[in-house]
UniProtKB/Swiss-Prot annotation:
PANTHER family: 60S RIBOSOMAL PROTEIN L21. Pfam families: Ribosomal_L21e. This is Large ribosomal subunit protein eL21B. Component of the large ribosomal subunit (LSU). Mature yeast ribosomes consist of a small (40S) and a large (60S) subunit. The 40S small subunit contains 1 molecule of ribosomal RNA (18S rRNA) and 33 different proteins (encoded by 57 genes). The large 60S subunit contains 3 rRNA molecules (25S, 5.8S and 5S rRNA) and 46 different proteins (encoded by 81 genes). Component of the ribosome, a large ribonucleoprotein complex responsible for the synthesis of proteins in the cell. The small ribosomal subunit (SSU) binds messenger RNAs (mRNAs) and translates the encoded message by selecting cognate aminoacyl-transfer RNA (tRNA) molecules. The large subunit (LSU) contains the ribosomal catalytic site termed the peptidyl transferase center (PTC), which catalyzes the formation of peptide bonds, thereby polymerizing the amino acids delivered by tRNAs into a polypeptide chain. The gene is RPL21B. GO terms for cellular component: cytosol; cytosolic large ribosomal subunit. It comes from Saccharomyces cerevisiae (strain ATCC 204508 / S288c) (Baker's yeast).
């Protein structure tokens, strides 16, 4: 018996709804605003078949290039062979969500702007570069009432 290679083949678990998340789509999904240039994640909603992406694009991140009343155009870079092709997808809003990939960066930009303004008001230089975790500070262990013990491995013995 031959194998079927349909458009939604092998998506039994990929497109299923989460536990206790079945039913109608929440209104907040439709009230989100998408603008050209926004970064979005593709996550297909199995209860809405219209405007659903192919299984390859599940979990991919792209940039919005077009917005219509019922769908959003997204540009994805797809690796084909040894090159990337720009793929343009037209997806319904149920199948995308705003990406959090730039969230930490934008928060850091705001924090740096606040630090820079505060330093300028005080007239001091400010360090804005992130520093890697430094080694722990040195400590002194007292041996008073705490005699060091010499440890040795237990010899391996076999009794057969």
């Amino acid at each position: 018996m031959g194998k079927s290679h349909g458009y939604r083949s092998r998506t039994r678990y990929m497109f299923q709804r989460d536990f206790r998340k079945h039913g109608a789509v929440h209104m907040s999904t439709y009230l989100k605003i998408y603008k050209v240039g926004d970064i979005v994640d593709i996550k297909a909603n199995g209860s809405i078949q219209k405007g659903m992406p192919h299984k390859f694009y599940q979990g991919k991140t792209g940039v919005v290039y077009n917005v219509t009343k019922s769908s959003v155009g997204v540009i994805i870079n797809k690796m084909v062979g040894n090159r990337y092709l720009e793929k343009r997808l037209n997806l319904r809003v149920e199948h995308i969500k705003h990406s959090k990939c730039r969230q930490e960066f934008l928060e850091r930009v705001k924090a740096n702007a606040a630090k820079r303004a505060e330093a300028k008001a005080q007239g001091v230089a400010v360090q804005l570069k992130r520093q890697p975790a430094q080694p722990r500070e040195s400590r002194i262990v007292s041996t008073e009432g705490n005699v060091p013990q010499t440890l040795a491995p237990v010899p391996y013995e076999t009794f057969i």
